[in-house]
């Protein structure tokens, strides 16, 4: 929880009141929300479940995009990144199956500090695959 502690410290230091963190399965929370309340949702390096038999456990899929669409305000943003190429392809396929998001060509999240997972991925020669989406309907 060291990473969460650092984020909480930064939130406190900067006196931010409009940020909420979830350390569990966000899908359980989103399923309970019945209105569009979020301006943006960031999902940075979700578990890639690299083994083929575990791919069904991956968070980002068409169903999750539908759930997230429900809780985003109109023109709200969804940012997803992964460092696993085959997960990126799967995410891209899920996005292409939906017409509820506009894919933004340039990311407004390029300023984000890299996480330890992202830094390690780059050091190991893996690429970061960002997806920046805007709710359009």
How does the language model describe each region?
Residues 9-10, 71-74, 126-127, 132:
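Aromatic-rich, lipid-facing transmembrane alpha helices and their immediate juxtamembrane interface loops
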Residues 38-59:
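A short SAM/SAH-binding and catalytic strip from SAM-dependent methyltransferases
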Residues 1-6, 88:
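Short alpha-helix immediately C-terminal to the canonical SAM-binding loop
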Residues 88-137:
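Class I S-adenosyl-L-methionine
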Residues 53-54, 77-98:
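Conserved class I S-adenosyl-L-methionine
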Residues 16, 73, 96-98:
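Short, well-ordered coil/turn elements that cap or connect secondary structure elements
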Residues 5-40:
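S-adenosyl-L-methionine
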